[in-house]
Amino acid sequence: MRRLPGLFPCTGVGSLPHLDPGPAVREVVSRFPEIPYWPQLPRRTPLEHMYPQYAATLPGAWISGGKLSMRSGEELLPEAEVFYELFLSGDLSPFAIPPERAAGLAGLLSAAAGPFPAVKGQVTGPVSFGLMVCDREKKPVFYDPVGRDVLVKYLLRVAQWQAAQLTRLSETVVLVIDEPYLASMGSAIVSLPGEEVIAVLDEIFEGLPGTVCGIHCCANTDWGLVLSSKTRYLSFDAYEYADSLLLYAEDVAAFFARGGVLAFGVVPTAAEAIARETAETLADRMETILDKLSARGIPRDDIVGSAVITPACGLGTLPEGTAERALRLCEGLSSLLRARYGRRSP
């Protein structure tokens, strides 16, 4: 797989609180020149929330009262037939994310000079999408075979379209699927066999062979299950949940052995923590995490050589100034860790 640039490069997770995509994109590119990402801007419009944002041409979908729903079963079949014909054609243009639903993506593509060493995008994952979006009977569409299959294949095409757009900025594209519902796996809320979860995740990953594909989950989950997928990039909340990953040291070691990238979300997303922390305190926290992983038998060089620095999650609910401080903390932490390890990115 493609290697990401430099040592401890930094990038973002997704959302920013800005209303204007121009300043948001400029902030991202200035702070993360090695791996810029397109910022989601949910305060601009409800259409930039994590489910409607990717549903512009989703078969059987409608929005009522600000809520996205989707037809399922026999009711979906006529639209599903049309969709499958379009899917098999290989044409990606019908799956474009319109600028009104992704102003940050449009802004990055039009304003960023590039080329960059790498560039990152994101899409809501099929598990979370399918469990959050319901049909007329208020049943999550993931539990309907027709709805699930259409949804997974639709999101695959959206991801492929996005990756194709981002190659205009870099040969190395990181495409991360956001899966908050993985934190509910095994609970009374979500009763899904693990193999079904992995099957839909891998359908996305297998359809993006030239892309560094990944998963973001900003809470605790069954990391062994997640790492059994074909993900090449794991983004997690290392500020709050780093110790949970220690329980899966063998899985993490195997992930590194196959060239995986671990994105440490070690910069907090709570306003009070952002105000309190500094690059120095976060570097010490990161060193503690590295010590613990090394103590579990994972070579420190493997971790350091594959680490990316990010915020723990999106920053869209924060004041602009606080979110921008979090980005500066990522930038400062990245620089400090490079200095500590005596190397600089090329």
List the model feature ranges, each with a label.
Residues 54-58, 76-87, 158-168, 212-223, ...:
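Noncatalytic linker/hinge segments flanking ATPase motor cores
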Residues 4, 9, 26, 214, ...:
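Short, flexible coil/linker segments at or flanking structured domains
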Residues 20, 100, 104, 147, ...:
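Soluble or luminal CAZymes and related metallo-dependent hydrolases
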Residues 25, 101-117, 155-171, 249-255, ...:
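Short amphipathic alpha-helices and their capping/turn segments at secondary-structure boundaries
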Residues 232-343:
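Catalytic-face loop-and-helix region of soluble metabolic enzyme cores
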Residues 121, 140-250, 261-264, 268, ...:
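Active-site loop segments of alpha/beta catalytic cores
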Residues 1-144, 228, 260, 278, ...:
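Alpha/beta catalytic barrel-like cores
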Residues 124, 178-180, 310-313:
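Glycine-rich beta-strand-to-loop/alpha-helix junction loops that act as flexible
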